[in-house]
Amino acid sequence: MYAEETNNVTAIKDIRAREILDSRGNPTIEADVILADGTIGRAAAPSGASTGSREALELRDGDKSRYMGKGVKKAVANVNSQIRSALMDKNVTAQQAIDDAMIALDGTDNKDNLGANAILAVSLAVAKAAAKSQSLPLHQYIADLRNQTSLTMPVPMMNIINGGEHADNTVDIQEFMIEPVGFSSFSEALRAGTEIFHSLKSVLKSQGLNTAVGDEGGFAPNLRSNEEAITVIMQAIEQVGYTAGKDIHLALDCAATEFYKDGKYILAGEGNKSFDSQGFSDYLVGLARQYPIISIEDGLDESDWDGWKYLTEQIGDKVQLVGDDLFVTNPAILQEGIDKHIANAILIKFNQIGTLSETLDAIYLAKKNGYATIISHRSGETEDSTIADLAVGTAAGQIKTGSLCRSDRVAKYNQLLRIEQQVRASYRGREEFIGLRG
């Protein structure tokens, strides 16, 4: 329920938004929610490079004279006027009601009017202010929203080679990741991933390859094939004494929508090699059989549901098949995938849907139906580390927040280290993939 009395210490007394810069040097929106007792909750909206067509709308100004059209003054104005007026004197602890009020105020299916970035920044700032007002860490406040009693530390998906839309190189597959599953704590898993990251740098240098990094902090060398990215990572794992397939598994984010043209999957970096839907599925199946790949994200185009069905039938019992562009954190679309037995996991991105409450709806719908959940950053990030708290507070099981460099990525890992020390939540490692036989 909303609080009626304006002197309630948890009443919202002001909301302020501003333009800030994200990790790619593009504007994004940051919002402050200020309570009657002076408590401030602050949050920023991230931004993606490869985006699903059914994501909620990120409102940009389109004014080419400012930030090349990417300014967010309209979104800022929407927060400082319409959203502020609608939420003044409301009880900040009424997360669902506040999110519902913003959704109703917008009045569109994909938040066209106010912008998902405007709504999300306020939604997350509300949660942070509410947590502070109750003297709760954010992860615990999020857990309490859905009566999540057991907290776990997530297995990190560490993006150590960038390609596709995240780098200016010859690699088509967007992300090559490692998942340190064979460890007893998050801190030890993070250490292993960091050691492999530095080992990979030395492997690349020894082969005369570029060690500059992409949007998410992974290395972005020009390679002869996508498979070569896997082989250099395997060398890096071995070089520091870990066992691939036991201590460390591999994961891919193909972002296949980005190279799907006219019904064909075209690998430009491999001489425009072309596959039909079944052919590219078989290509991925072959990689998963040859290498210790535990997870494949967006292996097919978001509209290629027949291809997804085929891929799920081929390896869905052995490999985690993650829908990102496929599901866009939308409970209705996820339900369709569940009904059709498409994929077996969902990537969770706040800004694809636009509120914390809707994000939680997607997470718990997935959990209820046996789908794995991976909390994710975007390629355009800020120092905001809310996703770390979300991963723990929902016991999501996995988190995807980039490589082991760039402070916008490391901020999330560091927050997880703080949480682990504070709550001593368990790190389940390989048990997070217990449904897979591979």
UniProtKB/Swiss-Prot annotation:
Keywords: Cytoplasm, Glycolysis, Lyase, Magnesium, Metal-binding, Secreted. Its cofactor is Mg(2+). The keyword Magnesium applies. It catalyses: (2R)-2-phosphoglycerate = phosphoenolpyruvate + H2O. Its EC number is 4.2.1.11. Binds a second Mg(2+) ion via substrate during catalysis. This is Enolase. The lineage of its organism: Bacteria, Pseudomonadati, Pseudomonadota, Gammaproteobacteria, Moraxellales. The gene is eno.
